[in-house]
């Protein structure tokens, strides 16, 4: 009985480790999509190469240790319209899977504080959004 419990605990811990490891094919697909959907124009992913439009728009950078970190966002006053209307209301969010997907699907719903709203909704499938998520998440490097 003890052996069975230990085996179940070991299997569970191995599954957790595997879940944290990114799928390399999905990351590669996300990288291609990041380029073909021109995300790189606004979102910097290389510390040595600034994103041209991103500097002016103060767009989110995907460099360094950013995943799982908190950020302030301003809420849209009228989420039913496709145009961002500043509400003056701010909320703290964590850059995680849920917030990333929401930002890609509804970019005007919550805009990072001090950023200029301008990201158009991307015509993407659910699978493409998962690939973009995997790529962006893979870029976050914890500080040593």
Feature-to-residue mapping (PLM):
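Sec-dependent signal peptide recognition
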Residues: 2-8
């Amino acid at each position: 009985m003890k052996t069975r419990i230990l085996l179940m605990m070991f299997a569970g811990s191995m599954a957790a480790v595997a879940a944290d490891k990114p799928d390399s094919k999905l990351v590669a697909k996300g990288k291609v999509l990041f380029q073909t959907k021109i995300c790189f124009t606004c979102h910097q992913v290389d510390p040595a190469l600034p994103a041209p439009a991103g500097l002016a728009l103060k767009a989110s950078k995907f460099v360094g240790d950013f995943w799982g970190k908190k950020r302030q966002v301003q809420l849209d006053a009228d989420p039913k319209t496709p145009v961002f209307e500043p509400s003056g209301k701010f909320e703290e969010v964590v850059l995680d899977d849920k917030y990333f997907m929401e930002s890609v699907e509804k970019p005007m719903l919550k805009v990072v504080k001090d950023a200029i709203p301008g990201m158009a909704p991307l015509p993407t499938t659910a699978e493409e959004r998962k690939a973009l998520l995997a790529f962006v998440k893979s870029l976050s490097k914890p500080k040593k």
